[in-house]
Curated annotation (Swiss-Prot):
UniProt GO molecular function: structural constituent of ribosome
UniProt region (Disordered), positions on chain: 128-190
UniProt gene name: rplQ
Keywords: Ribonucleoprotein, Ribosomal protein
Chain ranges passing through the membrane: none
Compositional bias per record (Low complexity), positions renumbered to this chain: 143-154
Quaternary context: Part of the 50S ribosomal subunit. Contacts protein L32.
Cellular component, GO annotation: cytosolic large ribosomal subunit
Protein name per Swiss-Prot or TrEMBL: Large ribosomal subunit protein bL17
Classification via PANTHER family: LARGE RIBOSOMAL SUBUNIT PROTEIN BL17M, RIBOSOMAL PROTEIN L17
One GO term of the biological process aspect: translation
Acidic residues bias: start-end ranges: 179-190
InterPro entries registered for this protein in UniProt: Ribosomal_bL17 (IPR000456), Ribosomal_bL17_CS (IPR047859), Ribosomal_bL17_sf (IPR036373)
Origin species: Salinispora tropica (strain ATCC BAA-916 / DSM 44818 / JCM 13857 / NBRC 105044 / CNB-440)
Keyword Ribonucleoprotein: yes
Length: 190
């Protein structure tokens, strides 16, 4: 049986403290950082680090242990699938506490507790086939770009007008519209 913490409990009873820390941990994993009192942040830090360490194991027993503390399945999914893989090479120290000064209403010392590495939006991994296709398309676009540029007009050509097609478009307008159509097709393929 774990030894109870010394001193007063946060919020009164041990059960209330346990639930409050679980809710703080859930908010921390949802948002990446939260602002709370220094005391609550210091009490939350070991719990959050234990949960991240369990999430790094990734097995079913660890998931059930974490679900015993954090009741929200979406947060547990985020913890196991997004947060834990970021800390695969780190053996602890997943959180940071930054003191922010006293609260305006009651002058309680406040702090921000945050995950050390910022939450990043997961980039989709491109497979080899699509990466090769995109590189080939990029090469084609680069090869076509210099060919479409028209040479600078010489002094004798300043008075001459651009050739006009049957539809009334100039050559430059046709080239611009062709380029726009190609770019649109590439965006639709991607």
């Amino acid at each position: 049986m774990p030894t109870p913490t010394k001193g007063a409990r946060l919020g009164g009873s041990p059960a209330h403290e346990r639930l409050m820390l679980a809710n703080l941990a859930m908010s921390l994993f949802q948002h990446g950082k939260i602002q709370t009192t220094e005391t609550k942040a210091r009490r939350l830090r070991p719990l959050a680090e234990q949960l991240i360490t369990k999430a790094k194991r990734g097995d079913l027993a660890s998931r059930r242990r974490v679900l015993g503390v954090v009741k929200d399945k979406d947060v547990v999914y985020t913890l196991f699938e997004q947060i834990a893989p970021r800390y695969a090479n780190r053996n602890g120290g997943y959180t940071r506490i930054v003191k922010t000064g006293p609260r305006k209403g009651d002058a309680a010392p406040m702090a921000i507790i945050e995950l050390v590495e910022e939450l990043a939006v997961a980039q989709p991994k491109a497979n080899k086939k699509t990466a090769g296709r995109k590189a080939a398309q990029q090469d084609k676009v680069e090869a076509l770009a210099p060919a479409e540029e028209t040479p600078a007009p010489t002094s004798g050509d300043q008075d001459a007008e651009a050739p006009v097609s049957v539809s009334g478009d100039t050559a430059a307008a046709r080239a611009d519209s062709d380029l726009a159509v190609e770019e649109n097709n590439e965006q639709n393929k991607a």
